Amino acid sequence: ASSIESHGTVILGAIPSNSLRNQFDMKFGLIEQGDNPRKFLKKFSGIQTNLKILDNSAKGIGSMSIGDNDSIIRRLPLFENINGSLVPSLSLETLRVAIGASTFQIKSSNASGETAFGEETGINHVKLGNLIIPTNEDGSAWIHYTNDPIKTIPIWKILDKEFSEEFFEGKILIVGTSAPGLFDL
């Protein structure tokens, strides 16, 4: 926990659940404009969090949810409705911390400057710092995959004394397990 806190930029994931009702403190500001975004987001009654000491030490906590049920990831929900609280996706929360932003702005139908003609048509976009992310009505965003493969490095290479920490300068580092590794859980 002390290593997480002293680093200052660690983001932890939490898993939406309809059986668990864990709570954690949000680490961001939120501005909602227009219709209530909770109406348009996937709703869960709870969330599976980490140990409280770890959650409290992290700079942010994001929801780990995929969205589509066909195992092909095309869109990513940017927020989840967890028992009435808006929880950002792990990706969005990582971006918030990486750019040093403190507040999300969710602009939905019937917000100032948005055309909806009185209809509740959904979430239009999420603003984070100077970045505006257009969304589908359910608050999800299309994923634009790059042609460049993601660089993966096994932990044993990082733990080697010869490995230079400078490799990670200016980059976002995601630490996790491989899909086969999940079978041990």
Where are the regions that the model predicts?
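Non-transmembrane functional regions of envelope-associated proteins
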Residues: 1-131, 164-185
